[in-house]
UniProtKB/Swiss-Prot annotation:
Its main location: cytoplasm. It is found in: Cytoplasm; Golgi apparatus membrane; Cytoplasmic vesicle, COPI-coated vesicle membrane. The keyword Membrane applies. It comes from Caenorhabditis elegans. The coatomer is a cytosolic protein complex that binds to dilysine motifs and reversibly associates with Golgi non-clathrin-coated vesicles, which further mediate biosynthetic protein transport from the ER, via the Golgi up to the trans Golgi network. Coatomer complex is required for budding from Golgi membranes, and is essential for the retrograde Golgi-to-ER transport of dilysine-tagged proteins. Residues 161-180 have a biased composition (Basic and acidic residues). InterPro entries: AP2_Mu_C_sf, AP_mu_sigma_su, Coatomer_dsu, Longin-like_dom_sf, MHD. Residues 276-515 form the MHD domain. The gene is copd-1. Residues 187-198 have a biased composition (Low complexity). CDD domains: AP_delta-COPI_MHD (cd09254), Delta_COP_N (cd14830). GO terms for biological process: endoplasmic reticulum to Golgi vesicle-mediated transport; Golgi localization; protein transport; retrograde vesicle-mediated transport, Golgi to endoplasmic reticulum. This is Probable coatomer subunit delta. Oligomeric complex that consists of at least the alpha, beta, beta', gamma, delta, epsilon and zeta subunits.
Amino acid sequence: MVLIAACILSKTGKLLVARQFVNDMMRSRLEGLVDAFPKLIGNEKEAATRQHTFVETDSVRYVYHPLDNIYLVLVTTKNSNILEDLETLRLFVRVIPEYCRSNEEKEILAHDFDLIFAFDEVVTLGYRESVNLAQIRTFTEMDSHEERVFMQIKEAQEKAAKQAMAEKAKELKRAQKEALSRGLKPSYQSSTGISSSSTPNAAAVSEPAAPRPSAPKGPIGGGKALKLGGKTNNEDDFLDTLRQQGQSIAPVQKASLSGGVSSLAAPISTAPRVKREVVHVRTEEKINTRVSRDGGLESGEVQATVTLSIGSPEFIPISIKMNNGSAAGTQLQVHPNLDKKEWQSSSTLKIKPNGKPYPVNSDVGILKWKMALSEEEQLPISFNCWPQESSDGVQVNIEYTLQREDITLNNVRIIVPLPTATAPSVGECDGEYEYHKTKNVIVWSLAVIDSSNSSGTLEFSVPNGHCDHFFPVSVGFTSENLFVPITVQKVVKNDGSPVTYSVETTFNSENFEIV
């Protein structure tokens, strides 16, 4: 097909919006084609009642659709495919209500540029693009998740700077009152030019002028703190402030604010901190997976790192006996400074003879593993997302099933995107839910998922939208149970005497999506 132009005309023949898609046609020629259209349909009695119809001249074809007080007209070549033209016309008809509340002439003129931008997403150089209505809306909005995160951090920084200034002012007032109560002149008050010998008690008795609040020292609210991707000393304070305001954001990576997991789905651990002994072993395990909405695993991988921290030199010559419960397909790798033969024969982590000793008070990686997932049944939790379109809107049902009952999931959050400016009506929810209007998402939260609540459901409906609006679904959780059960059995010195040690294990979802 070759689509020459798309036009919106009033029933009286007035041209409201026109978008030309070919470059080899003069404006006067296009205006002549558009002006001829009302005359061609003027004698057709059924023109106002037909759903889809067309008229032809010697050179072009007009495919049009009547909409209340307007006509939507596509001007095409005569050799174009009429079926494709009608399909394109139907998409154009669906575009207009997305940007205009009615089909009145005033409303069309008020959103003419919005319609032109949308038309450009449908047709390029006279040929139809493979897009749907949701994609057109996304492309024209040009929404940026990174920009939203940056603005949130910027607002938090400004608020933190104001709080710091207020605290500094209070501190200065307290120091002023304490100095007055002791009968001393505050050290921060500037000299008035009067000799202290001439009026010895004036400075001590008179009420000093209120000090001007000075800008807080350090990087609080400084220009460099707003640098995108920059690392500042107060970064953790700003992120903590965000969390106190109810926002959950992922750690800001250097040189980029974008990540595979949305800020709301970033795992937050509320597990009590382990009392650290002189010998401390920490295992951190993460899962990355993409699951198809129709079922089946697109990609999946579990990665883990075991680190060792020793607080005293006398405990450096130690051996760590591990319970190796790794499944088939798990790739394990020990540190090059450790004895691989000891690991292969007895699952013991021990420094090689004449090897470099462990550093003191420093986390050192000693073991890591990676496991590729090939089936959805291997995941610790699975989801069934089922949006159903109807004349009243879209009914969405989401069900989770805990597949590994030996793993207890904490702080589980399922983030479901929603159509723009659409509030959900929740019918059933196991756990809690929260609607974030600014982010256009509904967050389904469960404090704990274990064998006692191994399945649950969230049901809600929205008045508009379609199935693609509710994907991808992001999932965040944390757990103290490892996916690959490789744990510490005992820690002993080289002479065989036992060593008191502490263990810390975490299993988090780094990027868990249903697409």
